[in-house]
Structure formats: C-alpha cells, structure tokens
C-alpha cells in the first residue's frame, strides 16, 4: 500500500501514528494511519481487506506521495459488511419511513433501495480508488445523503431536468447516468459523461436531463431558473429540480433566483440538501433562523421541511412539488434534512462534527432505515437484498476495470466542444 497523493502544496506528509498494528486484521476503508499535512490532520484508510503484515514508515517520519508505507495480505473471504450479503438493519426503529407499503409495488421499493445502495457502494469504491492513487484530483462525496438524490429524481419524469453541485455523484446516478460513464469521467477518460473534461465536480449528461454540475456555491440556481423560464415560455410541462446545499442560501444568487421564479411562477423545485455544514461551519453559526424552508414565505411560495433520510418521505414531497409546478402554481422550496458521513472533500478529516451528533445521525442512516422498514413492513426477504448487493458489486467491479482501460484525451481533443 502506497501513501496517496493528498494534493498538498508541500512535498512530504508526516505520519503521526498508526491506527492498526502488524498482524491485525483490517477491513477495506478502515482508518489505518493518521497523517498531517500543512492543511490538517487526516486519516488514510486501508485499500483492501486482510492482515496488516508490515509497516514500513515509523511515526513522525516524512513520507512522499507514492512511497510504500505498508504491506497487506489480502483476505480472500472477508466477512459481510454494509452493502454485502446481509440486509442492512436500522438502528433507529422508532423513526421508520413515513409512507405505507401498500401504496407501492415491490419492484418500485426495491428500485429505490438498489439505487441508494449503488450510490453508497460507488462512493466507497471511488474513495478507495483515490487512496490507491489510481484516480487523480479530489472528490466531494455524498455517503449518508443517498435518499435525497434518489427520492427527488424518482419523482421526476424522464424529460424533467436537474442541476447539481460539486457533490453530484449521487444526483447523476439517481437521474439515470450509467455507472460506466460516471466512473470514466472521474478517470478523465474520453468515454466519460463529459468526455473527461468535467471530472468529479462537473458530472452531467444533457441527453439524460442533467446539466453538468456547477462547482460554484449557488451557481446552479440562476441556471435552473433560466431553464424553467424557457420551459414555461415553450409551454412544456417540464420541471427543473435544482439541488444545492444549506450554505448556498447565503448567496445573492439564491435570493435573485427564487425571487424571479416566484414572480413568474416558474416550474422549479429548489432542493436544499441541508446537511448542517457549509464546509466546516455549522449552520447555527451563520443563520439565526436555521429552518431554511421558512424563507419561501418571504417570496410568496410554498416551502416544506422533510426528513431527508427517509427516501419515501422525500419521494412524496417531491412528487407533490412537481405536480404543483406542472399545475402552474409556481416554485416549491424543499428543505431536506440530512447528514454527510464524510468530510467536505477527501482531504477533510471532519473533526468538527461532534461525536454525539455523528452518532445520532448515523443511527438514522437512510439505507439502513429503509432496508429495515422493507423487511418489517413490505416483506422483502434477505434473498432480495443479497441479490441486489451481489449485482451491484459485479457492476462496480466491471466498471472499474473498464475505466482503467478507457482512452484518455489527446492533444487533438483540446478544442473539441469549445467552439460552435
């Protein structure tokens, strides 16, 4: 195992301490060592499941990226983990999903579960690919927020549109982008959804109704409003769902965009994924009224706060919002309360999240809650979960192998897509 490139301005990384000892069995993704850069302390996770046979760097030593730091003996038969052969269980049974199972077909419920699990497992694999050094740049991941993307996009029509942010992998998979085109894009390949020119922060596919992600905070809001205006002028029954984070509501673009949408009664759903943090700053430090949905009243349209970790609650709220838009009632602001299980980006150790806060939110993990509810209320069997998990792993494994062999842009690709 090599020291990953942590994109520091300095050349070396200081190893603070090992979090596992030689001879210890470790799981893929388990924190293995703590390191320090000029930015912050962070943890480096194991790239495989197995036994830590040897450590080759001592604490306080300076380590350049790419140097071998440990030897792992890969375990051929690791025990089942989240997303493995066992159904996920909720640790918060007193907070089940809101809707009744009789209203939904089994195939639909399982499609929601599979899409959420695909997003989670995709993000976990991407994290490991980054640590292995096979993927360049940085990534902003959405583990813990799968229900917001899946719930909203499942309520949209195929010809509806979404705008996204720098944290857009889940939005892309939920809107129908293929696993392969998304992974190819993260590898910078010409077969990626943006021909390798967008990268992690700008994924999208115009043919599938997803504008390439906008990395500027609140940058997608004016674009979504413009699209909604165009659809209204063209008399199309098309809705635009605009994803943004809680930090975006402090930007002028939010005020300008929602004000215009309200004034002209545009078919836009403003989807605020409120995960409580703008980068490392808690929402309570920047807002007196932290209930973001209340802001809609000031512009004269409906706002609603929803449990963003309940995929069915998100789906129902989004379906009603879309119906309101199509009926000509104007925009809707949905505030989806959720929580990211990772740092702002891969270099963020996330030390600012209090342990008790993390524990409380982790107990309400959207995938665990939904799988438990499916087992108890919709009579989904363990075999169903096992089949889904196995299918996802095969898909991801195949996509990774293909992405590693995908063609990279050449000098001849430099001007493609720039003019005309």
For the regions a protein language model found, what residue spans apply to each?
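N-terminal amphipathic, basic-rich helices that act as targeting or association modules
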Residues: 86-167, 405, 420
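Conserved thiamine diphosphate
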Residues: 232-238, 288-320, 363-389
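Small cofactor-carrier domains centered on a conserved lysine used for covalent cofactor attachment
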Residues: 1-76
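Intrinsically disordered, low-complexity Ser/Thr-rich linker and spacer segments
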Residues: 73-88
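Cofactor-binding active-site loop characterized by glycine-rich and histidine/acidic residues
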Residues: 134-264, 285-288, 293, 298-300
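A short, conserved beta-to-alpha structural element at the edge of catalytic cores
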Residues: 264-284
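Short gly/pro/ser/thr-enriched loop/turn and capping motifs at secondary-structure boundaries
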Residues: 170, 276-279, 340-342
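Glycine/aspartate-rich loop-and-adjacent alpha/beta segment that forms the canonical ThDP
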Residues: 94, 324-420
